[in-house]
Amino acid sequence: MRVCSTARNGLYSWAAQKGIPALLLERGGNGRWTSEEVEADCEDVLRLMNHLGIIKEDFKVIRQTEISKAVYEEASADGYWFPQVCAGQEVLKDALLGRWKSSDGMQNCEVRARFAGRVLYETTALGVRRNDPLVAYGTA
């Protein structure tokens, strides 16, 4: 799956904003990964190098899905996040993605999917700061 990011923070987005090609590979989650995921990342880099003409290899074609529409939900204030979905999960429109509660207990909200799609990531930490990412989902 490919996601064309519109993020304005982080080193990979800084490079892209400066016209420098950038690639962010994300596999695993919660700081955990498998040796198979590491091997897949290495193969992705080799595939990119092949595409750019840096190396010449024959790779089996893998059909990719490009996420063209994505939503990145963020915390509106410091608080607590209770995710109800996991990365990779398919969700329907209006599905409950998680619940957010402000630190002072004055604000509560349910975060629901605005459209059907696939969860790209979810924050698994309980405590979140204002503007921290909560969950992202998208569709082709």
Show which residues each predicted segment covers.
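Structured catalytic-domain cores with a bias toward divalent-metal coordination
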Residues: M1-A140
